[in-house]
């Protein structure tokens, strides 16, 4: 539905034998509904406005008077009008409505408020201004004579020492809050939780929302920020019905996915391999208990494990083939060698694990060259080799590992998207 929201001004509906702004917009855009916002002073115009709007030939809109009546002593306060008009626009805003705002009727403060709302908030709106018939100010200025100027000064009742100060210092609190909320929504939508946390924690924004809402958002952003600062596990994940390995892996994957969205490619490459190694290591430890032992933090094959020699031979053979030294008799891979993602893949191949799982690991390993440049050198990432499509595939490969190896339900993977929607909704 197309809805026109308009204040009723002193010149509406007809001025100097021409449409005033409200009538002209209705005539041109023919909205399905016209929502009229009256001030106390303009309420006397109700019958006149309705009759003139319905006089447009072939047009019979729904005319609705909004329940909010603007106080005469507030229509010249920008921040108040920003708050009130914002509430009115919000009331009629949804995915099915196209909103038209009249930027030419009402006090300058009402017009400015609607202009700001159109620019700042993410509403489906278009704002319309209407020029006067002569394309200039409504009241023409006639030059005064010297005597008329002198009389004007003399008759000015404010031109004395005891004049009444009618100026109002507008702090624009609501307008400022709207700007801050918009900025916070933008930061959260781009997953920049640390920047959003730094802003919302400022004391001057304690009244940005209700105490309950501001405390909730601050707690969430603090929790999210800890993940990227310290690799802490999300509070929500700690409460999920998962074991410790599943919680660690899910938390790490979600962190990688956010880094991918923020295009922190170097971090994604380094962390993706680490996560894959962790998941496969946990899988092998569970399925073949005792095969892997640790020398400090370094994983190695257990020489006492029944299949150890056969696995060593298989890995050694594949390593020699990859290096083109098949004829070398001496082993280049032994029980002293530290296991990594490639050797874990070889173990999965030895035990004939699912081919789809092996394909996913190979996909992660295919980016290992770029990963090593970042992790072990100061090389620039070749973005030609790392398109968004490849990074998306990398994320999908990691998801497959988490689902197939650790049994993590895929419904957890959109955690941050769900949280973002909730926080953004609260900041509207």
UniProtKB/Swiss-Prot annotation:
InterPro entries noted in UniProt: CRISPR-assoc_prot_Csm6 (IPR013489), Csm6_CARF (IPR053955), Csm6_HEPN (IPR053941)
Chain segments carrying region HEPN domain: 146-428
Gene3D superfamilies with a match to the protein in the record: Hypothetical protein VC1899 like domain (Restriction endonuclease-like) (3.40.50.10770)
Family: Belongs to the CRISPR-associated Csm6 family.
Record's function text: CRISPR (clustered regularly interspaced short palindromic repeat) is an adaptive immune system that provides protection against mobile genetic elements (viruses, transposable elements and conjugative plasmids). CRISPR clusters contain spacers, sequences complementary to antecedent mobile elements, and target invading nucleic acids. CRISPR clusters are transcribed and processed into CRISPR RNA (crRNA). The type III-A Csm complex binds crRNA and acts as a crRNA-guided RNase, DNase and cyclic oligoadenylate synthase; binding of target RNA cognate to the crRNA is required for all activities.
Subunit structure: Homodimer. The composite ssRNase active site is formed at the dimer interface.
Identification of the protein by name: CRISPR system endoribonuclease Csm6
